[in-house]
Amino acid sequence: MTIEDLPDFPLEGNPLFGRYPFIFSASDTPVIFSISAAPMPSDCEFSFFDPNDASCQEILFDPKTSVSELFAILRQWVPQVQQNIDIIGNEILKRGCNVNDRDGLTDMTLLHYTCKSGAHGIGDVETAVKFATQLIDLGADISLRSRWTNMNALHYAAYFDVPELIRVILKTSKPKDVDATCSDFNFGTALHIAAYNLCAGAVKCLLEQGANPAFRNDKGQIPADVVPDPVDMPLEMADAAATAKEIKQMLLDAVPLSCNISKAMLPNYDHVTGKAMLTSLGLKLGDRVVIAGQKVGTLRFCGTTEFASGQWAGIELDEPEGKNNGSVGKVQYFKCAPKYGIFAPLSKISKAKGRRKNITHTPSTKAAVPLIRSQKIDVAHVTSKVNTGLMTSKKDSASESTLSLPPGEELKTVTEKDVALLGSVSSCSSTSSLEHRQSYPKKQNAISSNKKTMSKSPSLSSRASAGLNSSATSTANNSRCEGELRLGERVLVVGQRLGTIRFFGTTNFAPGYWYGIELEKPHGKNDGSVGGVQYFSCSPRYGIFAPPSRVQRVTDSLDTLSEISSNKQNHSYPGFRRSFSTTSASSQKEINRRNAFSKSKAALRRSWSSTPTAGGIEGSVKLHEGSQVLLTSSNEMGTVRYVGPTDFASGIWLGLELRSAKGKNDGSVGDKRYFTCKPNHGVLVRPSRVTYRGINGSKLVDENC
């Protein structure tokens, strides 16, 4: 029933009747009040309602202020409102409302709002407990659910980690109510909700009140299964990792021994000494190490910690790119300067290589590349996965047919194969990459000048064949890489920035091999130099360095590269291989080669990859609720919860639920709710502010939503 469905009541004698005749005394039937905006004083200097302000108090206590307007005030997620839940709630009750009446926008009752108002840092727990007790004494139904979230009062109290309210609610409930499920959380219980959101106080309280720690949700998970893994958390979330470890252990200890909890238990290496772990990895304290192939430093600590389970490494970085000074949560594990300390799982560190120290870098690319020779491997017995049209039945004939190709035709074969392959080079050995680059011109010269001499050398012939049959070579030699990128190629960096490769080799600023890219727009970091060493030359802010795993080709073939219009070249391209154009003329040999490659690489294709049309791939994919996107302004991942128009601005907007509390709201702006999420996890942005797999969000929404 809504407020419009109510019958007529006698209005005489009630001072509240006048402008709002729907207000009546002591209604026995709960109603849903229509949506209204929060009233604000005309001379108000702030954007929210403050019950402590004199002008706001005048509106609050005015009998003409409607219940809908009072509910609108309760929706404001600010301390000034939430800490005065009892004052605003009593004003609603004074207007003759039923204690179970609902807000038309959120479908929440006063008890639901009270459970939210107990959130630490926003509301006041003591006030919320007193008012919740008052509401329950007046007949508030604790089993009522919001039809938007399907959450009842217990679920809200668990979600916002208010154990004091959990005790009040369960005091008058039935024993089974403690395990009431919620569809928005995979039909898990309040214990699942508290565990997933790392609400340690709520978890402890629910267990004390008899919540079932072995209850399984629709995915077959017990509460211990839904606790976020501390190892997957960013290092700056050390406190959250410690809480996760505590909750996990608390839940596992509460599970009956007869329950199979093998899936819930994490591998525990706490009993293994740090020295033993380091020895097994070939490391020792004081060694130079690399973290995830990026940051370099000195190993200062290895062992168990208070903030997470398992063995952790403490590293003093070379640059102030860390998170701490060697301490986390008031526990000092090692000492270093502020911002130079960082902790990482042992699986993320490796010993730094010292080979780059003897290299002198110059603007010349050749001078920056060391001469490294790999072992000569006979690959004549290996059958190529790609049909290149070369004879491979005999070793001599294979070498002869390979070397008898004209230089131009050999180059064409390599180029077509390289372009057809997916532009991923993350698994390629840097040694083989350099050898391939340096030996290729030599092989060309030798072919044109003295074919007979080369054909007599089995090892050299094998290497020449390997240059044309890289898929066969990669089977025999893991250091050879398919689809190798070359200087001068247009590439995509981190799925977003377009540029041209100007440098490849080792650097002084980090171990391993790096690409130096000249970007097409001034979105870079430098002019081709880092730390006083010039690796290549370009305009300021046009240069950037990236590891091979972050660089990929822009297009599928050199034939289509020249046909791409300038506006398409500025688009962001996703990291998957597009299909070949069916309109291009191909020989039977090329078709066979492509089919063979397609079968061997089918796992690398995206399920939504298709032949590009005039509108590109953007036309086949649209953002929808549940899509995972990147908010570029804060580099935060989020889930799309709303796509459509808003009341505060024209056009299409996206409602995002961020993974961390770096948002602006809980899914509502002003007086309107667009979606529901945790406080400070919600944000509404233009589609152009997000990217989806490297594609700008503005290309993935329908303006007619």
UniProtKB/Swiss-Prot annotation:
Location of the CAP-Gly domain: 303-345, 505-547, 644-686
Biased composition (Low complexity): 455-479
UniProt entry keywords in alphabetical sequence: ANK repeat, Phosphoprotein, Repeat
PROSITE patterns, per the entry: ANK_REP_REGION, ANK_REPEAT, CAP_GLY_1, CAP_GLY_2
Any GO BP: cytoplasmic microtubule organization
Residue windows of the ANK repeats: 65-101, 149-180, 186-215
Keyword Phosphoprotein: yes
One Gene Ontology term of the molecular function aspect: microtubule plus-end binding
Composition skew (Polar residues), residue ranges: 441-452
Gene Ontology cellular-component annotations: cell cortex; intracellular membrane-bounded organelle; microtubule plus-end; nucleus
Superkingdom in the source lineage: Eukaryota
SUPFAM superfamilies: Ankyrin repeat, Cap-Gly domain
SMART domains found in the cross-reference section: ANK, CAP_GLY
Pfam families given in the database record: Ank_2, CAP_GLY
Region annotated Disordered, chain positions: 391-410, 431-479
Modified residues (Phosphoserine): S557, S609
InterPro entries xrefs: Ankyrin_rpt, Ankyrin_rpt-contain_sf, CAP-Gly_dom_sf, CAP-Gly_domain
Protein name stated in the entry: CAP-Gly domain-containing linker protein 4
Organism: Homo sapiens (Human)
Protein's gene: CLIP4
